Amino acid sequence: MKPENKLPVLDLISAEMKTVVNTLQPDLPSWPATGTIAEQRQYYTLERRFWNAGAPEMATRAYMVPTKYGQVETRLFCPQPDSPATLFYLHGGGFILGNLDTHDRIMRLLASYSQCTVIGINYTLSPEARFPQAIEEIVAACCYFHQQAEDYQINMSRIGFAGDSAGAMLALASALWLRDKQIDCGKIAGVLLWYGLYGLRDSVTRRLLGGAWDGLTQQDLQMYEEAYLSNDADRESPYYCLFNNDLTREVPPCFIAGAEFDPLLDDSRLLYQTLAAHQQPCEFKLYPGTLHAFLHYSRMMKTADEALRDGAQFFTAQL
């Protein structure tokens, strides 16, 4: 798509989304576009500090969890002693950026609104880790907490997965992995998916949308994919292109959230249409006027807070 043919996204987004886009952090250096991946990760962590401020206080615990790849950091957010379920959160960041600090406010709000224990899993980033390492680490963490639930005083009888962007793909891929390999980590009550990518190679929204404002041009998406996958054949894996998995049976209830001006929106629409066509429990909600990654901006955007509340409400309704 010739860039001039794309939609004028920054003219079309909502007033509160424009406020976010125009918010300057005076102490923040410029984005290191030509820097190393380590420098870009450091910048992302610094940039997100402002947006994570003011999150609800609650009991928080950190544990290192053993996997076949080594130790993986996890963080537990416990809003109440008697949680009705445990929700595993997988952060976004194109598989190459992000950590438990960059998504701290999202996890705290999700715990507060659901009153469930939320466990963030700091899966190993790409390109250091290649597909399917992140999924295997997530599954290993689930198994570990299921086996040690009494010691950690968490309720693993009912669990869920949640994630944004690349984390949404990991959330659903992990749920399908547990189903397909018949691994018991507790009943999967629901999966919460905010503006994920699920395997489309091309789409209308990928053509019309995406630019410097969201880091989701076709070239950007190709770069993330090349960093994450081990080889070309992985593109068709049912745990990367989730549309190649069996979505006609035993898919946990899915809350699918779409951002109106997100190039990945058609991934969410197709996922919803596929699940609905096969009578799998699912709900789709579009958030008007929003860009990809809007969930981070609940300090300033009522829509972001609403999207988190909607996901939490969907999950608790399944319990």
UniProtKB/Swiss-Prot annotation:
SUPFAM superfamilies: alpha/beta-Hydrolases (SSF53474). It is an enzyme of class 3 (hydrolase). The active site is at 165, 262, 292. InterPro entries: AB_hydrolase_3, AB_hydrolase_fold, Acetyl_esterase, GDXG_lipolytic_enzyme, Lipase_GDXG_HIS_AS, Lipase_GDXG_put_SER_AS. GO terms for cellular component: cytoplasm. A motif (Involved in the stabilization of the negatively charged intermediate by the formation of the oxyanion hole) lies at residues 91-93. GO terms for molecular function: carboxylic ester hydrolase activity. It is found in: Cytoplasm. PROSITE patterns: LIPASE_GDXG_HIS, LIPASE_GDXG_SER. It comes from the Bacteria. Its EC number is 3.1.1.-. Homodimer. Interacts with MalT and MelA. Displays esterase activity towards short chain fatty esters (acyl chain length of up to 8 carbons). Able to hydrolyze triacetylglycerol (triacetin) and tributyrylglycerol (tributyrin), but not trioleylglycerol (triolein) or cholesterol oleate. Negatively regulates MalT activity by antagonizing maltotriose binding. Inhibits MelA galactosidase activity. Belongs to the 'GDXG' lipolytic enzyme family. This is Acetyl esterase.
